[in-house]
Amino acid sequence: MTLKSLPAWTALQSHFEQIRHARLRDWFAPENDRAPTRAERFTIPGGGLAADFSKNRIDDETLRLLVQLARDAGVEARRDAMFAGEIVNPTEGRAALHTALRATDPQAPFHAQVSAERAKMATFARAVRSGTWTGYTGKRIRHVINIGIGGSDLGPKMVVHALHHVATPEISTHFVSNVDGADLARVLEQVDPEETLAIIVSKTFTTLETMTNARSLRDWFVARGCPEDALAKHFVGVSANPAEVVKFGIAADNVFEMWDWVGGRYSLWSAVGLSIMIAIGPEQFDELLAGANDMDRHFREAPLERNLPVLLGLIGIWYRNFFGSQSYLVAPYSEALHYLPSYLQQLEMESNGKSARLDGTFVDYPTSAVTWGEPGTNGQHAFFQMLHQGPTIVPIDFIAVLTPEHPLAGHHPKLLANCFAQSEALMLGRTLEEARKVAGPGKEALAPHLTFPGNRPTTTLLVDALTPRTLGALIALYEHKVLVQATVWDINPFDQWGVELGKILGKVVEGDLSAESVDPAKHDSSTTALIERARAALKR
């Protein structure tokens, strides 16, 4: 059966018409919000986190029908198939076993292989952190440069930044992803080659951006005095293609393995996270894995009605497919989580930005929403105006860390107050009558500008303290949310064919930029004109 023919879908359509104009402020009114309160009913713990879903435009019947939709769509079966190592990425004929990277059960798929590679990572990380692994002049490593793009960059960068407070102060970690040379050049201004270790991360070890930066970095080392036969002290590779790593010039002993059954955007738990392990240490890296495993167990064991990834995913579907929301916002009220929205952009949109169903037919309903965000309180002074008073409804995930990871007094209560106040203001709004009172006598014309529609839906995720364990759980929560939504939408969240066409055409255009002339028949007139302008500029 297709999604729209499922009984729960039909029931949700009828239910939506019944409650689409219901007001959250009415549901929270004292005469309606009796014990157990709405907040008590809709706040759910799991995996060391808690989620307050009460400020969403849902009632008990909404959740009942959404959970039935998950059952009808086969969420439980697909979840179990993924954990069992079955082929859940049919377009590439692969399993999706990122969960095996943090599993503690010896019977988990590839457990021995995963454990051996993690032990190799730990040995290397300890050597770098302790100073026993040195550069070619005998100086200890003080800078690590991670070169990768997409999942080989966004996840590690996000985690290293988030866990800065538990990282060693002896080593600075830098991330280079963009093929724009300015990205690498800016980092090279900050480092000494004698004290720098490069980690080159690419599943194929042929990725254009990564290999361009890797070659430039290798040339930089040599130009600044590092003998070519000493580069092994400064370069390691992470790849599913070891032969290509060795061909590049990295010693075979310096190659760490990743596997084709782990997608790039799910890979920070593997050797792709080597930069994380060097920064925070093997023991803390194990805690990161343990937190993800906590959420894995919750996802597998909790009933769907009390299952955080399931509910987060289903509520997202409620807004995307019934309310017609085009985007959703992630607002972590934590500067440590600065890069979480960027990480989730790839996780959500590269996974679920698809139009083809698993059977090859095309969907007739929206799939992935546009994912965006910025840490609070910065976002309040940029785009919250639109969230409060614009005509577009944007569902929001607020993320609040209850305990600060810094010693500065007076900051954290203000941060939390802003987070909670924003969710309340978005829910309550301000009526025209209330606005008239705020405007005051004689300022009737101002009142419409002081109104807030309210009824804007938000979820608040609560993290007691930002530790490797709670961060691991938070990341895994969103990973599993993506699977839930993909299953309901009947799409494959583990491939990314949408990035291929641009790559293919990019190689053609790159050749044309250095050619004597460009055949106008090769491209449309716009692209041809752009190439000609660029060719002229490159010759200056």
From Swiss-Prot:
Cellular localisation: Cytoplasm
GO biological process assignments: gluconeogenesis; glucose 6-phosphate metabolic process; glycolytic process
- Which residues catalyse the reaction? 350 (proton donor), 381, 503
Q: Is Transmembrane one of the keywords? A: no
Which GO-annotated molecular functions does the record name? carbohydrate derivative binding; glucose-6-phosphate isomerase activity; monosaccharide binding
Can you supply one Gene Ontology CC term for this chain's record?
cytosol
Tell me which InterPro entries the record gives: G6P_Isomerase, G6P_Isomerase_C, Phosphoglucose_isomerase_CS, SIS_dom_sf, SIS_PGI_1, SIS_PGI_2
Provide the E.C. number(s) assigned to this enzyme.
5.3.1.9
Q: In which pathway does it act?
A: Carbohydrate biosynthesis; gluconeogenesis; Carbohydrate degradation; glycolysis; D-glyceraldehyde 3-phosphate and glycerone phosphate from D-glucose: step 2/4
Which CDD domains would you find in this protein's record?
Answer: SIS_PGI_1, SIS_PGI_2
Pfam families this protein is in? PGI (PF00342)
**Keywords, alphabetical:** Cytoplasm, Gluconeogenesis, Glycolysis, Isomerase
This enzyme catalyses:
alpha-D-glucose 6-phosphate = beta-D-fructose 6-phosphate
Q: Which family does the record assign?
A: Belongs to the GPI family.
- Task performed by this protein: Catalyzes the reversible isomerization of glucose-6-phosphate to fructose-6-phosphate.
User: Could you tell me what this protein is called?
Assistant: Glucose-6-phosphate isomerase
